[in-house]
């Protein structure tokens, strides 16, 4: 028998790489040939799974405006990789989706100097539809690919994600209205 140990990260407990190694070792102890192959869904830990190395650390604002350091990583081909969760992470000790902002991710992206950029979304404290990011970044610094674990329109995002960020039912409704207004301002795909 052979086994393939391919977990994603276990939030706050183990990275995908460490979880895969431990699972594979457990299989081997049971006499099973095993290979560790960590995976990621575009959220936390994606940069590590892709083999991106830290190129520099920059000071950004967390979701509540407090300073924190976040890495800009690079793949072997020079593509820059940033993870939203490293700039504006979801912290279970501070859940306030009405004030959490994506501005820090914008600050991180604004510091990127590369020919290509990969942005990994997920594991964030905010439900602002990228409004904070847009305050800082008017134009992306390079052709950009976004990795995310769920494709959800702005109009459904608060219902889907705000409760995990601490929103009450009334706050979810308020956030839904705010995101619906924001979606009216966003251009349609393929239109300026």
Which stretches of residues belong to each language-model region?
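N-terminal loops that bind phosphate or other acidic moieties
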Residues: 1-192
């Amino acid at each position: 028998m052979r086994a393939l140990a391919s977990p994603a990260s276990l939030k706050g407990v183990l990275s995908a790489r460490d979880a895969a190694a431990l699972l594979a070792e457990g299989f081997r102890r049971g006499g099973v040939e095993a290979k560790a192959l960590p995976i990621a869904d575009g959220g936390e830990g994606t940069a590590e799974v892709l083999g991106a190395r830290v190129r520099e650390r920059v000071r950004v604002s967390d979701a509540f405006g407090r300073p924190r350091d976040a890495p800009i990583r690079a793949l072997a081909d020079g593509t820059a990789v940033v993870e939203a969760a490293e700039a504006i992470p979801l912290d279970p000790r501070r859940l306030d989706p009405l004030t959490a902002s994506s501005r820090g991710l914008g600050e991180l992206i604004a510091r990127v100097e590369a020919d290509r950029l990969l942005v990994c979304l997920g594991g964030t404290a905010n439900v602002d539809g990228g409004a904070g990011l847009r305050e800082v970044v008017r134009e992306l610094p390079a052709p950009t690919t976004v990795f995310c674990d769920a494709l959800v329109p702005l109009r459904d995002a608060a219902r889907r994600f705000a409760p995990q960020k601490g929103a009450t039912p009334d706050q979810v409704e308020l956030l839904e209205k705010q995101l619906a207004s924001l979606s009216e301002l966003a251009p349609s795909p393929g239109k300026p």
